[in-house]
Amino acid sequence: MSDGKKTKTTVDIYGQHFTIVGEESRAHMRYVAGIVDDKMREINEKNPYLDINKLAVLTAVNVVHDYVKLQEKCEKLERQLKEKD
């Protein structure tokens, strides 16, 4: 979507309802929320003693870690492509 038009949708993350607004499609926002929900549940299985705030922060740290690793991999591939030219 990303045409500047705002889309509003309600999602469920870890048993809580959130209304989110973005420029992406509702399907995309639900997909992203589903990933967050899955990650929170995955971390909770390994750390059931965490309160919701610590679980949310640990989830954010894990997701950003994954993002940084993918970003580094992308940059490495871009460098390799430039070296071939």
Swiss-Prot record:
It comes from the Bacteria. It holds the Pfam family ZapA. GO terms for cellular component: cell division site; cell septum; cytosol; plasma membrane. Keywords: Cell cycle, Cell division, Coiled coil, Cytoplasm, Septation. It is found in: Cytoplasm. SUPFAM superfamilies: Cell division protein ZapA-like (SSF102829). GO terms for biological process: division septum assembly; FtsZ-dependent cytokinesis; septin ring assembly. Its main location: cytoplasm. The keyword Cell cycle applies. The keyword Chaperone does not apply. Belongs to the ZapA family. Type 2 subfamily. Activator of cell division through the inhibition of FtsZ GTPase activity, therefore promoting FtsZ assembly into bundles of protofilaments necessary for the formation of the division Z ring. It is recruited early at mid-cell but it is not essential for cell division. NCBIfam families: PRK14126.1. This is Cell division protein ZapA. It comes from Bacillus subtilis (strain 168).
